[in-house]
Structures are given as C-alpha cells and as structure tokens.
Amino acid sequence: MNFSTLPPEINSALIFGGAGSEPMSAAAVAWDQLAMELASAAASFNSVTSGLVGESWLGPSSAAMAAAVAPYLGWLAAAAAQAQRSATQAAALVAEFEAVRAAMVQPALVAANRSDLVSLVFSNFFGQNAPAIAAIEAAYEQMWAIDVSVMSAYHAGASAVASALTPFTAPPQNLTDLPAQLAAAPAAVVTAAITSSKGVLANLSLGLANSGFGQMGAANLGILNLGSLNPGGNNFGLGNVGSNNVGLGNTGNGNIGFGNTGNGNIGFGLTGDNQQGFGGWNSGTGNIGLFNSGTGNIGIGNTGTGNFGIGNSGTSYNTGIGNTGQANTGFFNAGIANTGIGNTGNYNTGSFNLGSFNTGDFNTGSSNTGFFNPGNLNTGVGNTGNVNTGGFNSGNYSNGFFWRGDYQGLIGFSGTLTIPAAGLDLNGLGSVGPITIPSITIPEIGLGINSSGALVGPINVPPITVPAIGLGINSTGALVGPINIPPITLNSIGLELSAFQVINVGSISIPASPLAIGLFGVNPTVGSIGPGSISIQLGTPEIPAIPPFFPGFPPDYVTVSGQIGPITFLSGGYSLPAIPLGIDVGGGLGPFTVFPDGYSLPAIPLGIDVGGGLGPFTVFPDGYSLPAIPLGIDVGGGLGPFTVFPDGYSLPAIPLGIDVGGAIGPLTTPPITIPSIPLGIDVSGSLGPINIPIEIAGTPGFGNSTTTPSSGFFNSGTGGTSGFGNVGSGGSGFWNIAGNLGNSGFLNVGPLTSGILNFGNTVSGLYNTSTLGLATSAFHSGVGNTDSQLAGFMRNAAGGTLFNFGFANDGTLNLGNANLGDYNVGSGNVGSYNFGSGNIGNGSFGFGNIGSNNFGFGNVGSNNLGFANTGPGLTEALHNIGFGNIGGNNYGFANIGNGNIGFGNTGTGNIGIGLTGDNQVGFGALNSGSGNIGFFNSGNGNIGFFNSGNGNVGIGNSGNYNTGLGNVGNANTGLFNTGNVNTGIGNAGSYNTGSYNAGDTNTGDLNPGNANTGYLNLGDLNTGWGNIGDLNTGALISGSYSNGILWRGDYQGLIGYSDTLSIPAIPLSVEVNGGIGPIVVPDITIPGIPLSLNALGGVGPIVVPDITIPGIPLSLNALGGVGPIVVPDITIPGIPLSLNALGGVGPIVVPDITIPGIPLSLNALGGVGPIVVPDITIPGIPLSLNALGGVGPITVPGVPISRIPLTINIRIPVNITLNELPFNVAGIFTGYIGPIPLSTFVLGVTLAGGTLESGIQGFSVNPFGLNIPLSGATNAVTIPGFAINPFGLNVPLSGGTSPVTIPGFAINPFGLNVPLSGGTSPVTIPGFTIPGSPLNLTANGGLGPINIPINITSAPGFGNSTTTPSSGFFNSGDGSASGFGNVGPGISGLWNQVPNALQGGVSGIYNVGQLASGVANLGNTVSGFNNTSTVGHLTAAFNSGVNNIGQMLLGFFSPGAGP
C-alpha cells in the first residue's frame, strides 16, 4: 500500500479507528500460555516415561517404549519453544503499533485544521486571510508528511516481525495418548493491526457539508455544483433548486439570474419558461423580501416553501441561511430538522454531523452525544465503537477511555444476603380432654295429626269463565278552565279631517288553560285548552262630512290633527271562570267465557319400531372384596376453600295433616364423658436459611434503565440512546423525551426534533411548539413559533407575531410578565394596551383598574382619572376625576352620586363640600352620611378622609368595610384593591393575599389566574411563577399538572415509584414424633321415650344455609398405611310402637330425578301423526256502557272596557297682508302701493281627553244534562283448527342418550288409618375403643415467596394528598389547592384550612375559614391580620384590618359588631 497518496484524514483514521493493539496483546498472552502448557506437558511426559523405564517397567519392551516416545517428547519441547517465540513477536508487534499510534497526528487536529481552513475561506472576501490560509495549508502538509513517514516505518517494522515467524512442524503420527489439542494447534501468523475505513471515499467534494460528488462550496446536494446551497446538478451560484442554473434562488432548470421559477429564464423574478427581463422582486406566491421563488418565503433568495432567512433552497420551513433540507434552524444544513451549522444528517443539534440524532459536532455516526464519534449511541469524544461512555473507545458497550474490547469498564454488583437457619425444637407431653358432653333435655313436643283420606285424580280442566268486569267511570268536580285572556291593546289611531287609516289590532294570544277531569277509580287527568291567538283587523271607518257652522268654515287652511288611543281593552286581563263538567259512565265489560266446553288435545298416534337391545350385563359376577389399602402419600398444598350449597338449600314445606293424640318426652340424655386423650409430641427441625439475592448488573453508561443498552447517564425508556437523562429510543443530548423515533438537543419533547426546548414532531430551533401533537410532523424551525409548518421567530398560525418581552405572556408584543392580551406594558394585566400592572380591561394607565381607559389606581369602570372610583355596588363608573367617588361624572373626592363637584357630597349635581341632596351649592358639613369620623366622608360609619362607602377606615375608600387607601371592593386590607376581601395592593380580583392580582384567591403578586401561590401565573392553582397552564408546581410551564420548569405538555416531571419487594421462599423442615390415644368411648344409653303426641301443621320448609370450609394448607409426608378398618356390628333392638293415628299423609312432592346417559344403539322405524288441532273459539265479549252527567253551569263575567284616551290638535295659520293701495297725485304720479305682508302666525289649540270606562255585563249558562248510552259486544273469534298428516320416520340412532331429568311431581293426600300405641324400649349403644395411633410426621416445605408490591403513583406537586389534583407541597383535604400545607378546596398560600363541607377560597398564611385573605384570620369574608369572626364559617363577617374580633369590623383592635 502506498501511504503517501492518502491524506492525513485517512491515515490517522486507519490507526485510531480500528481495534488497536488489544487483539494482538491478547494473542501474545495466548501464545505465552500455550508455550507454558506445552513445556509442562513435555516435562510431565518425560517424567512419566523415565519413571516407567527406570523403575517399574524393565526389559526390552520398556526400551522399545522409550524409543517410540522420544520423537514425541522432542516435538513437545520444540513446539513449546516455538510458541514462546510467537508470543515474543506478538508483543514486539504491539510495541511497534503503540509507537506508531503515539507518533501519528490525532484525527481531531486534522479536522480542526480543515475546519479552520473552511472558516478562513468563507470569510476571505477581500483576501485578508491569505497569510492565515497559507499557514493552515502548510500545517496540513506537515501533518500529511508525518503520517506518511510514520506509516512507512510501521510497515517496515511489522514486516520484520512477521518475517521472523516460522511455521509449526506436524507432530508424529500414531501416538494416541498425546493430547488431541496438540494436533490441532494452529500455525499463527501475526498480521498488522491495521483496519480499513468504515466508509468508502467517493465524495471528492471541496467545501463544507456537501452531499454528492464533485461539489465545490458548502451545503450542496447533488453533483458538480459550484457555489453553495444547491440541491441538484451543475448549478453555479447560491440557493438554486434544480440543475444547470446560474445565479441566486432559482427554481427549475437552466435559469440565469435571481429568483426565477421555471426553465430557461434569464432575468429577475420571472415565472414560466424561456422568459427574459424583470418579472418582480420575487416569483412564486406569498413571498416577502427579494429574489425569492416558491411559496410563503420571507427573506432574500429563498426557494421552496415557508423558508425564513437568506438563500434557503430546502423544500420547506427552514430558518437561517443556506439550508437545503427541511425544517432546519441554522446555516448550511442539508438534512431534516437540524439545529446548527453544516449538518448533512437529520435531526442533529450541533454542527458538521454526517449522521443523525447527534448532539454535538463532527459525528459521523448517529445518536451520539459529544464530538468526533464515528460509532453510534456514544456519549463522549472520538468513540469508534457503539454504545460507549467516555472517549476514544474502539470496542462496544464500554465505560472509560481507550478501551478496545466490549463491555469493558462496567460497574456492577452481585451477592446474596443470607440469614442462617434458625433451629426449631418443640417437645411436649400432655393430653386432650377429658371431653364432657352435658345432659341434653328435649322438652315435650306436641303433635296434632288428623287425616280423613284423599284421592289422586282424575285431573280435569273445567271451563274458565271471566265474570263481568264493571266499568264505573264517574267524574265529579271536573273543571274546564279557568281561561285567562290577557289585556288587549289597540295602537294609537291618528285623528285628521279626512278618512281614518286602517286600524290594526295586534294578535290576541289566549294562554293555555288547565283542563282537569277527575274520574272515580281513575287517576285524575290534567290537560289544558289552548294556547291560541286571535288576529283582528278593523277596516277604514267611515266618518260623515262635518256640516259647516257658518259659510266658509272650516276653511281649507285649518288643520285638525291628533290621535285616539292607544286603547287597552281588559287592562287587567280577563279570566273566564272554570266550567263545571260532570260525567258518570256506567256499564261493564263481559261476562265472557274462555273454553266454554273445555278444551281437549286429542291423542297423537306414534308408531315406532325399535330394534336392538340393552344388556345383558352382570355387575360383580364373583362378588367384590375391598382388601386393606396401604397408604403412602406425599401431600403438598391445601384443601379448599370450598362451599357446600353456595346458595343454600331449601327443602319445600311438606304438608302433614295428622292428628295424633299423646306426646313424646320429655327426653333427657345423661352426661356423656370422653376421658382424656394422651398426647405426646416431639417437634424438631429448622427455619431457613433465608437467601436474599442481590444483583446489580454492570451495564454501559451510568444509572441507565433503558430496555436496550445505552451510553451516558440516567437514560430511561426503550433505549439505546446517549447523553444525559433522555427518555426513549435512538436519541442523544440532555433531558429529551423522544419515544421510539429519536431526537437530539436539550429538553426537547417529541420525536425527530433538534435544538432546545421544542415540543412536537419534526421541529428544530429554540422553544417552538407544535399544535399537531407528537404523532404528526410539524416542520417547524426558528425560535418561539406556535402551530405547524412555520419558520422564523415568534410566529403563530395566522402568520402574526408572538413576540413578547418578558415571561409567561399570552398575547402579542407585551412588555412585562404574565400579561393576557396584546401591547401591554407592565405585568399581570388582562386585556390590551394597558400601562401598569394588575389591570382588567383595555387602555388603562396605572394598576388594579377594572374597565377601560382609566388613569390611576383601583378604578372600576371607564374613563376615570384618579383612584378608587366605582359605581354603586361595584358597577361601572364613568368619567370620574378624583378618588373615592361612587357614581359617574364626579369631580373631586368621596362623592356618592352623579355629576358632583367637590368633596364628600351625597346626591346628584352638587357643587361644594359635604352636601346631601341634589343640585346644591355650598358647604354642608365636614362629612355627609351618618356616623362618619374624619373629613369629607360620605356614606355611613367611615373613619378617615374621603371615604364614600360604609364602614371604611382610611383614605379614599369607596367600598365597604375596607381598611387602607383607595379600596373599591369590600372588606379589603391594603391599597387600591378593586375586588373583595383582599390583603395587599392593587388587586382587581378577590380574596387575594399579595398585590396586583387580577384573579381570585391568589397568594403572591401579579397573578391573572386563580388560587395560585407565587407570581405571574396566568393559569389556576399553580405553585411557582410564570405558569400559563393549571395545577403546575414550578416555573414557566404552559402545560398542566406538571412539576418543573418550562414544560409545555401535561403531567410532565411527575415523580412516582412502582416496584415489588420479593422475599424468596424460606425452607422449612419439621419432624413431629408422638402419638394420640387411645380414645375410649363409654356406653351410651338412651332411656325409654314416653310417647304422647298431638301433631298439627306441617314440617318444613327446611333450609340449610351455606356451609363454607376454609382452605386447609397441607405440606405433609405421610408414610405407612391405613387399614384394614373393621366396624363391628351395631344392633338397635326393636322399638315397640302403639299408636292410633287418624288423618292423612300428603301431598308428597317428589323432587326432580336425574338419570344419567345410557349407551344406546337403536334403529327407529315408524311414523308420527296425524296430529289434529281442533278449532279454538273465543266467544263474543258483551259491552254495555252508559255515560250520565252534565255540563255547566257556565258563567261569563262582565267585560270591562277601559277609558280610551283622545287627543285633538287644531292648528289655524293666520297671514296679515296689506293689499294694494292705488294712488294718483295730481296726474303726476299714478300707481299703487302694496301688497305689504305684515305678519304670519298660527293659532292652535290641543284638545285632550278620552272616553269614560264602561263594560259589558256578564251572563250565565245553566247546567244541561249529559246521557250517552253505549252498549254492544265484540264478535266471536274462532281460530280454525288444523291437522298435520302422518309422515314417515326412519332415523338410525347410535351413541347414547343425554342425561335425563324426571321432573318432580306431587302425590295428593291419601287416607291414613293406622292404630299406633305403646312406646319405645331403652336403646343401648355399646361402648367402643379406638386404639392409640402413632404420629410420625415429617414436613418439608417453605414459607413464601412473599411479594410486597410498592406503588407510589405520580401526581402534580410534592407530597399532596388532596382528593382532586393540587400543586405545591403537602396539601390535603378535598382540593384542588396550591401552596404549602393547606387543607381544603380552592386554597393558595401556606398552612390555610377550610373546614369540611365548605366551598373554600382562601389565600395567605395560617387562615381558617373561607373567602379569606391575609395572615392568621378566622372566619368568612375576612382580610388583614389576626382578625376573628364571631358569626361562624357560613356567614360573611366583612372584617378587615388588624386584630378585630366580631363582624363588620375594620381598622385596628376593634371588638363587637360594626355598622
């Protein structure tokens, strides 16, 4: 091999990238061991043969044996020497290799030299880097020369070592006693420890991050491109997509220019083919910038879709410069979803990675975390193997540095905790018993038995007659109505001296009226009549001409106008009373008879010829004897549990009709004593030993729990992966969650991602969030984008910006923190265009305002200037200037009302101080209202200045029971609070402890959400700061139910534990020796039973309840036998009986009898039928009904007619004009003067009045009768009979019958006449003895294994035990809550408690109650410090201030009740 033609990248990689000297070192050790074994074998063989020849074996045969053995002995000695030489040469080659490796140039230095060259070339715009480039190239040439010289020397040295080795000679044949392995000893040949490169050098490109052949430039994808960012072939320029393009940002083939889309274009921004000229700054659609082609690009010279930056030619959604792939963030990336510079692989976070899923730089493998790793899944630097943690490892699955084998440097532990056996020795002698059964007395049992005989059968079904069914349907007190008619209004009717207009009467609606009919024996029926409507339209009324009072009147110029109405009829409505309705329906249904002549199903002919037979069979032809049964059983396990009669067993009652005279008893049994039973037991054995295995296997990496091996630290999930704290498969980096598809970077959640803090699928950059979930590719790149298929900075789905300057903002262009809205300056605002903090609304300047366009603090409403201005009852106030005003358009302080100017006025339109009333001017008093102390207070019971509510202490409070300055709400302690029961400053919400909270029940500051403990939380029930979601514990979390920082998903960062503690089986060995018995049972005598019985009634039912036998654990080893068992005769002597019984027995019920299957082999021939079903006739059902009753009386009350208003306007225009006046002056002047208009005016009068009220008198309709006879009957119905003709039957039958169950049956009572008399004789059961039984028991078994499951579920927060999820620490009760140590629902803060069954809502520290804030308060609706309510937890106390005890108290140290 000519090493001089190879660059240093290849020569250094060949030395450093292979297995190293480890295999050759192992070979040297193996050869040395073989040499020692051969030398030992030669010495042993020589010793044995010499001893035989010289001592125990003499003669010619021994000499012949010695001569035969000599060649083999010589061969063993020569082979041992030759193996030792091989070991020496192998060690020499290891030393040669290590010397070469130490002299070679490190690959990292070569890569750094080339990287520096690329950087200098790209920045050498004006030739300023020429000296540095020359120096870099000179250093590179020196590296080349060093590598060539070292490799040449290594080749010479390795060749010399190899040439010194000689082949082994074959051993002599036909000596079967020689070890067989010597015949198979290999002739080892030492080869150089040189490995080939892992890939094939076929790129021949000059530049950076090129993929393809013949490239010159950077980030090219294809062949023969000159320039940068060109995917395709033969392109010259930047960012061209296609082939044979010259220029910038062209899409297509053969284009010359900038931003052209198509083929063969020459110019700028042309779209189409073969065009020339200037088309525009961009081609394509939706592009913003210069020379872009494609769709939706922003920047300069981009092609593709949705790219942001300069010269991106990738297919879609790149952010940066010169990216040719998809969804990349950075510079010159040719892959997919990379974050960094010059990555040709996919999903990398870093620079110049050829592989995929890498976090770091210059990794040619995949899923590495670190630098210069040619292998895969490595964590560290320069690892050529796979799944290594460390540096420069050429093996696999190793931890450390410079390992060349596999599974090296792993740390594990394996051992067993053994508890030794514990001895068991129990010796006992004793007995069981005696057992005494006391006397048992059975009292007299009375019997009554009477029987008079009975017959069973025949059974006839008589006709079944259904008698007449009476129908008594009577209605009394039925009502129709009442019917209510609402008021009827006629619209106004214009009144003019002309025809009237059409009069329209609006629709008249009649509402639903109840209809209740009560029927005798039938549930009352409630219905209704209506609703309905009546539309009435009156035509044009005709009014006759008005006769003139005198000629010419009324003149034409007189106008009469006005109106009549509106007219309202029935102004109070109209009610038509209920109409009585009584209906009496009589009659009946039936009678009718079913089966009047009975019904008989005739016999069904059945002819079957059965051939075959059953039997014969003999049971026990020679008798049967059961001999003694030896018993030797090793029984382990347990018996049971099992349940006899799981549902119980009920024996139905047996009717017994017997009249027996006499009685039985009383019976007394004597005491029965069982003597003591001797018992002797000797127990010995042991418990244990107990072995608890402990094994912690050594695995790659440190602290990994992945299913498949991983490198790095504390990785979990499927594996393999690299890095630190990653979850999933195929990933790299730090604290990423990837699933099974892999990712890279830092704190990313989702597959195929790179960068930092991204959430989604196929996302690169910083803090981007996909809305498509983790299963769908989002193609995101850039910074802070939310949605999908976006590139750039802080963009959303609508193409707008999400840029905010601050934390936890939800909106656009906010300056501050935790704002919900747009264009806010400050923190904790809900709305837009606010300047300040804690405002709810739009356009306010200040803090704690609710509304819009307020300037100041704590205002409720709009356009207020000042602080603590509000409307009545916290309604919206408008246009107040000042503070503490309640109302609108007030100027000044503490005014209550509207339009006041001054201080402490109560009313409207006042100008002055302390005025009460309306439109007054002056000075009324220092305070208005009542019970005020101080100056310029209005309202009641205030102490201080400029207070306008009730019961306030302080300055400028416009709410009630506030302590402080400028509070608008109720029971606040602090400054400028617009909500209720706050403790702090500027809270627009309620029940907060802190400042500037727009939400409710927060402990902290600037929380727009509710029940948070902390700061700047937009969500609810968070513990921490800047959380947008709900129930989080931590900071800057936009998801919900999570613990930690910057989570965007739900249920992230939760800690739980689940495992099983297994205790293996514990050996148990017990030996029991002893015996039981003998057991002696003495004679048992049952004395005579006097009989005098009188039996009445029956026996039963007899119910046997469930019988449960629990499990019986067994672990026995029984040896021996049982039997034979002999039961001696038991004789019961005759019992004389003398009875006289009259009565009967029965009925007797026989339960189901089950017969098991019987094997049969039958052939059935014959037929079935005919089957005839006769007609079935249902006779007619008579029907006779008679409805009697009446309707009425009906009473219609009077209809009132309301007054009709009438208004007439008369207008008479008057014009006064001086007519023409002729004149003639001495014939000199002739003419006229005028006409001269003097005046024009109107004379008018309005006539108003109306008609008088009137009405229509009511009337009544007398009752009238109702008689509806209904009679008849249904027609008879006959179901025709039918017949089934005979049909043949030829069925071969074989097999067996199924189990047959004979249903139970009943035997009717039958007569009994049996004379019974006398009594029973005494009965003696002879005693018997059970001899003693030796007891020898050996029990071997164990205790366990015992599995103890341990499962600690994960939940939001830490140590919470609330019923519903909570954030924070150690909260308990119903929840949800936030904070530390709270008990109950809706709580924030520390150590607060809501009593059981209350709705909650508490903030602060050490409060007990509900709807409270502050510190150490007790009660309902309390703020401040150490206040106590005396009205319990269910009643609002409205306390504020410090150390008050009572209700409606404020200020400091007040007892009792306030105003």
Curated annotation (Swiss-Prot):
Facilitates a shift in the ensuing immunity toward the Th2 phenotype and could aid in immune evasion by mycobacteria. Interacts with human Toll-like receptor 2 (TLR2) and triggers functional maturation of human dendritic cells (DCs), leading to secretion of IL-4, IL-5 and IL-10 from CD4(+) T cells and induction of Th2 immune response. Maturation of DCs involves PI3K, ERK1/2, p38 MAPK and NF-kappa-B signaling pathways. Keywords: Cell membrane, Cell wall, Membrane, Secreted, Virulence. Interacts with human TLR2. Belongs to the mycobacterial PPE family. It is found in: Cell membrane; Secreted, Cell wall; Cell surface. Pfam families: Pentapeptide_2 (PF01469), PPE (PF00823). PANTHER family: GLUTAMINE-RICH PROTEIN 2. One of its GO terms (biological process) is symbiont-mediated activation of host signal transduction pathway via agonism of host cell surface receptor. One of its GO terms (cellular component) is plasma membrane. The keyword ATP-binding does not apply. InterPro entries: Mycobac_pentapep, PPE_dom, PPE_sf. Its main location: membrane. This is PPE family protein PPE34.
